[in-house]
UniProtKB/Swiss-Prot annotation:
EC numbers, comma separated: 4.2.1.20
Pfam hit, one: Trp_syntA
Record's function text: The alpha subunit is responsible for the aldol cleavage of indoleglycerol phosphate to indole and glyceraldehyde 3-phosphate.
Molecular-function GO term, any one: tryptophan synthase activity
Protein name in the entry: Tryptophan synthase alpha chain
UniProt keyword list: Amino-acid biosynthesis, Aromatic amino acid biosynthesis, Lyase, Tryptophan biosynthesis
Domain of life from the UniProt record: Bacteria
Length: 268
């Protein structure tokens, strides 16, 4: 959990925002998935947001649904994902690592044992996409017991009560939703969200990272100028993977270049 605090502090000292890519673990294969993460870190990723393959990802558009299907086709299970997470943590001891997932995967072996496993492999945060903050008590309590930050989504239409609740219960960072709907860079992020960022700050929420529809440098700049601490890009990253499935070397170099361009946008 503390890795987020240190990361945001370090970036603030350099007057930079955070660039956080999202990928599904095991897409398109476990081996290549680890190389993809290396390529994104080489391009300047400040933290990682990772998905565990799930059969019915409600919050995700077609790009990330296909990533889930490719990982399933490669035989990836949650147990494989935890092995991969342990390897990623060993390689990047200081990088914040977050999971973005669905409640069924948390329930499957018991909520407490799930968060215990997260702590064991060095996961810093977990966002359970289909559990709203008002239903989150058993999840966030288990998370806090195991020093894992519970992450909550702040929708663009959040009212005052919800903003207070997110601020009070969230740790690590706050996932600021660019717009309603499902993930995907097909639909642009709608801005500005400055009034939400200001409110979250007023209520002492964890720093806001803006996600959903972030696919170009200008959107990262806009998110940061609206006061967000950084931006999360998922579908745009996964589309590069999908586009170059037959040419892994090109895929990896494109991913590094994409990460570098979005990271550069956090500096201006």
């Amino acid at each position: 959990m503390e890795r987020y605090d240190l990361c945001f502090k370090r970036l603030a000292e350099k007057q930079e925002g955070a660039f956080v890519p999202f990928v599904t673990l095991g897409d398109p294969t476990p081996e290549l998935s680890l190389q993809i993460i290396d390529a994104l870190v080489a391009g300047g990723a400040d933290a990682l947001e990772l998905g565990i393959p799930f059969s019915d990802p409600l919050a995700d558009g077609p790009t990330i649904q296909n990533a889930n299907l490719r990982a399933f086709a490669a035989g990836v299970t949650p147990e494989h994902c935890f092995d991969m997470l342990a390897a990623i943590r060993q390689k990047y001891p200081d990088m914040p690592i977050g999971l973005l997932m669905y409640a069924n995967l948390v329930f499957s072996n018991g909520i407490d044992s799930f968060y215990a496993r997260c702590q064991q492999v060095g996961v810093d945060s977990v966002l359970v996409a289909d559990v709203p903050v008002e239903e989150s008590a058993p999840f966030r309590q288990a998370a806090m017991r195991h020093n894992v930050a519970p992450i909550f989504i702040c929708p663009p239409n959040a009212g005052d009560d919800l903003l207070r609740e997110i601020s009070s219960h969230g740790r690590g960072y706050t996932y600021l939703l660019s717009r309603a709907g499902v993930t995907g860079s097909e639909t642009r992020a709608s801005l500005p969200l400055k009034h939400l960022v200001d409110k979250l700050r007023e209520y002492h929420a964890a720093p806001a990272l803006q996600g959903f529809g972030i696919s170009e440098a200008s959107q990262v700049q806009q998110a940061i100028s609206a006061g967000a601490a950084g931006a999360i890009s998922g579908s745009a990253v996964v589309r590069i993977i999908e586009k170059h499935l037959n040419d892994p070397a090109l895929m990896l170099s494109e991913l590094t270049a994409f990460a570098a361009s979005l990271k550069a946008a956090t500096r201006s």
